[in-house]
């Protein structure tokens, strides 16, 4: 299974649409958003994902997602949010995945070393990072799709069969 991992879109319409186009072209099976969509109107851009992908579109909220109720009502029509909105535990492609916008590094390391999850996904720092622990656990921050802080607009694609990931730059 191929999973696109996006974070920190911050309402950047052009980059969201460009990422959606790449995701559709590459026949990605699922999308996970690690938070900071920002406004509920982003739904109209993510709505351009292929129907088969929208069935596997999951996300958590970030610290800049102030309109959580509206995001859940609007974007929630195509994106599945966890009950608390902040942390998601899901199984996709036979892999157990933990998603949170801004866990502390110590928490990421504890989760990785516990081997309770195969993949740990985060956002918030806007810095892209792929780390593979000795036990095979992947910890990924896809960077920022918006490109506002680093000047790099990025997201990640995970191949769950190979248990590897690469960063896509727009």
PLM feature segments, named:
Residues 2-91:
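Core catalytic region of metal-dependent phosphoesterases/phosphodiesterases
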Residues 66-75, 112, 137-143:
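Short Pro/Gly-enriched beta-strand edge/turn motifs at strand-loop
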Residues 84-93, 115-116, 133-170:
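Binuclear metal-dependent phosphoesterase catalytic core
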Residues 85-125:
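Internal catalytic-core helix/loop-beta-alpha segment
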Residues 2-10, 94-102, 138-143, 167:
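Active-site-proximal beta-strand elements of phosphoester/diester hydrolases
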Residues 32, 58-60, 119-121, 138-140, ...:
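Hydrophobic/aromatic beta-strand patches that form the interior of the parallel beta-sheet core
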Residues 41, 59-62, 110, 160, ...:
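Metal-centered catalytic cores of metalloenzymes
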Residues 10-14, 38-41, 64-70, 104-109, ...:
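Active-site environment of divalent metal-dependent phosphoester hydrolases
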């Amino acid at each position: 299974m191929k999973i696109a991992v996006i974070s920190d879109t911050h309402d950047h319409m052009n980059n969201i649409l460009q990422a959606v186009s790449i995701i559709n072209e590459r026949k990605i099976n699922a999308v996970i958003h690690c938070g900071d969509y920002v406004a509920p109107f982003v739904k109209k851009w993510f709505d351009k994902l292929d129907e088969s992908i929208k069935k596997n579109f999951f996300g958590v909220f970030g610290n800049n997602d102030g309109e959580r109720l509206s995001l859940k009502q609007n974007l929630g029509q195509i994106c599945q949010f966890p009950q608390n909105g902040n942390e998601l535990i899901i199984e996709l492609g036979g892999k157990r995945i933990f998603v949170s916008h801004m866990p502390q590094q110590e928490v990421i390391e504890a989760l990785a070393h516990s081997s309770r999850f195969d993949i740990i996904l985060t956002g918030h720092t806007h810095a892209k990072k792929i780390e593979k622990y000795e036990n095979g656990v992947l910890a990924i921050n896809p960077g920022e799709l918006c490109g506002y802080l680093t000047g790099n607009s990025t997201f990640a694609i995970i191949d769950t069969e190979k248990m590897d990931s690469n960063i896509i730059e727009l």
